[in-house]
Amino acid sequence: MASDKPLRLLLGFDYGTRQIGVAVGQAVTGQARELCVLKAQNGVPDWNRVEALIKEWQPDAIVVGLPLNMDGSPSEMSERAEKFGRRLNGRFNLPVFTHDERLTTYAAKGERLAQGQRDGYRERPVDALAAALLLEGWLAEHPD
């Protein structure tokens, strides 16, 4: 989905059926940071929480991670993530882009291991960090 408005601030979503990681990123720095993890019921978030994040951060666009298979083909979750993106666009009238999120959760767990976390992903989930990594990937591919 194209946008004529400069994309300065973006929110990234790492979509999941039980949890959705959220990150914020800036185009000027190309960096993103984790914000929060939203609980989801069968992939449906608390839309009031999503709306509160949109109002607080006022992003120019949204990036949703697209969970592709390792060969690049769509996964079972790909359609659900795309549907989530369409709902974000419909509810908030913001441009929504998808970005290949292969291995972001793996990379996020690797970062947490490097920080000393050995387990406890329920207590300290990696979803928001995965969202930050996928958002940084999108920003790197769209530098302007």
UniProtKB/Swiss-Prot annotation:
Can you tell me which family this protein belongs to? Answer: Belongs to the YqgF nuclease family.
Q: Spell out the GO cellular component terms annotated for this protein, sorted alphabetically and separated by semicolons.
A: cytoplasm
Q: Which UniProt keywords apply?
A: Cytoplasm, Hydrolase, Nuclease, Ribosome biogenesis
Its protein name is Putative pre-16S rRNA nuclease
Any one of the GO BP annotations: rRNA 5'-end processing
> What Pfam family is a match, any one?
RuvX
What domain of life does the native source organism fall in?
Bacteria
Q: What is its EC number?
A: 3.1.-.-
What SMART domains does this protein map onto? YqgFc
Q: What is its main location?
A: cytoplasm
Q: Name one GO molecular function term.
A: nuclease activity
Annotated source species: Pseudomonas aeruginosa (strain ATCC 15692 / DSM 22644 / CIP 104116 / JCM 14847 / LMG 12228 / 1C / PRS 101 / PAO1)
Q: What does this protein do?
A: Could be a nuclease involved in processing of the 5'-end of pre-16S rRNA.
